[in-house]
Amino acid sequence: MEVQEFCENMEEIEDENYDEEKSARTSDENRKQNHSEIEKRRRDKMNTYINELSSMIPMCFAMQRKLDKLTVLRMAVQHLRGIRGSGSLHPFNGSDYRPSFLSDQELKMIILQASEGFLFVVGCDRGRILYVSDSVSSVLNSTQADLLGQSWFDVLHPKDIGKVKEQLSSLEQCPRERLIDAKTMLPVKTDVPQSLCRLCPGARRSFFCRMKLRTASNNQIKEESDTSSSSRSSTKRKSRLTTGHKYRVIQCTGYLKSWTPIKDEDQDADSDEQTTNLSCLVAIGRIPPNVRNSTVPASLDNHPNIRHVLFISRHSGEGKFLFIDQRATLVIGFLPQEILGTSFYEYFHNEDIAALMESHKMVMQVPEKVTTQVYRFRCKDNSYIQLQSEWRAFKNPWTSEIDYIIAKNSVFL
């Protein structure tokens, strides 16, 4: 009996030890699992911060490939050192940007007087004019009360609305990450959180557009009608000039700005829409300076000195404009969207077409660049300006056909 009782007691002790060991193993596994979950959350949070940091650093944003964490931190340190060396925390938000002896109002007046333009703020979500300085009256003949709260798209020329919407868009501010699936070796579409697709303060914008000009009886400034075209006769243009809207070419220079703090990702999804709406374009609008200071003489016997005003254009093999630099607006008066799709022969002087046709034929046959003679190019006000161009044809290596012609145009005054 005693032996049997002893064996039973030993079995009970072994069962208790087994249960203790099992519970100990279970607790260890739970601790490891909890530790793994904590580490995963920590890594996810770190990756989120690294992605946010890379979206704010211009050097990281310019890279096409996905950067590792150490590279992002290194570029962030370099960017902060550069900002510290510039003397302000931010080129637009720094508190030391304004001299201490000037008030904000005085600084604004000095900037507007120096630029001979007007300051305006437009919301990027709906194009609403949030602010406009009173100096707009000297440029557009409209008062501050006329434009404040109105839609900017109602003031713009209809053909310029699409271009302006591109300038208000902030989609290019999203991180450019190209991930490759290790199994299929195909690019993987990554859903970037909308909170990361915000505006980086200081994203610069510079473009030309046409704004509606309020007519006045004593208006002596140069105007243009939205119904005028180079292909219409002067009779139709004169008859419609009094009835159509008047527009003025405005050069807009500024930057995109977001004035609200970025919300955390764990907040409600409906708050993302409010975050994207709180962004705006802060810009100064002014009349672009006229490069031309004299009219072109009837003959080109005496060649003037070259003026280093260059603009680039790209043409099809037939001579149609596929692209033109914005600097051309300062020279010829046409906006890029007005001249694209038209042939450059429409703007050449009749007496220069024969020589330019020979240059056109030559550039289609030789791989070297071809320099044209000094020729006359028709501007928007129907006057002529002297240009000289270097044409070079780009041939597709696969089809041996000419894809386009690159032109470097120099202004002669």
From Swiss-Prot:
Subcellular location(s) of the protein: Nucleus
Record's keyword annotation contains Repeat: yes
Superkingdom of origin organism: Eukaryota
Signal peptide: none
Limits of the PAC domain: 372-413
Residue ranges of the region described as Disordered: 1-43, 219-242
SUPFAM superfamilies: HLH, helix-loop-helix DNA-binding domain (SSF47459), PYP-like sensor domain (PAS domain) (SSF55785)
PANTHER family the record matches: CIRCADIAN PROTEIN CLOCK/ARNT/BMAL/PAS
Cited function: Putative transcription factor involved in the generation of biological rhythms. Activates cycling transcription of Period (PER) and Timeless (TIM) by binding to the E-box (5'-CACGTG-3') present in their promoters.
Protein name per its UniProtKB record: Protein cycle
Species of the source: Drosophila melanogaster (Fruit fly)
Name of encoding gene: cyc
